[in-house]
């Protein structure tokens, strides 16, 4: 097969795709993946598919899967050229969803798409993904890096994550045991986490704030990019030691939209917003965006990243266990009987 001599010889690189850069990235990230390896991994990076043996000791194992991204928090990371923690966010958004069902995360895969591959940026992001997997106790077994010129501007990139976990069928947490009198425990968030960033960026824009301006012990931009807290290990230990009726990951929609997802029809959640500390970052966002407090609570986590619902007689033990595991915890409310004319979530003490 011969090439025509009267036309320039084109390569994939001429079209904007650098195979060598992709290969260099794979070499850079092998260590990050290897550091997360669980004993059940049979084959990880490099193959067409990762192989993972089911952990032993389960009578009726159920696999739980989830996928998520980090939304427009990515734009903030690119704007600040700070890419070392956005991978932690990606893992957190997936594994925190799995633990809500009582599932232990087993393995994780990522998808990284960009217009022009920067090996340094991508390697930094994937190293963060590895750190997130280590925090969650799951293995980074593979992923896809897609260089797509014309689809993304320059070295802009997008991320998606995919995670699979496992839970004993008889121990699935589905909210069916929730009953009036149960206690709601809130686990403190580490910041805005990974939801509401379109509003965050709009507030920064209209307020004229500088991302490099001081904010507490950091800058405003650094405070906004604080990585999402991963709650997996403390919650797995809690589930082993005390009854848990429901868990709710407080993501987009805040307490108002996420608590109803785990409540049976007869139950409503009554949350005292004065029972937990509102981080100053949320006060800053509310003030500078003139955002109604009800809108704040249906957009942001407002300081509570995960809610645990436990029987009243287990509340003290749960608070003690979570605190001993390093979590900042608050007794934020209780479950009451719900009637049709009432909201499913009542925020006591909310003043607009």
UniProtKB/Swiss-Prot annotation:
Coiled-coil segments on the chain, per record: none
Keyword check for Cytoplasm: yes
GO-annotated molecular function: ATP binding; phosphoribosylamine-glycine ligase activity; phosphoribosylformylglycinamidine cyclo-ligase activity
Any single GO BP term: adenine biosynthetic process
EC number: 6.3.3.1
Keyword Cytoplasm set for record: yes
Subcellular location per the Swiss-Prot or TrEMBL entry: Cytoplasm
Pathway: Purine metabolism; IMP biosynthesis via de novo pathway; 5-amino-1-(5-phospho-D-ribosyl)imidazole from N(2)-formyl-N(1)-(5-phospho-D-ribosyl)glycinamide: step 2/2
This protein's name: Phosphoribosylformylglycinamidine cyclo-ligase
Species this protein is from: Hahella chejuensis (strain KCTC 2396)
Lineage: Bacteria, Pseudomonadati, Pseudomonadota, Gammaproteobacteria, Oceanospirillales
Gene: purM
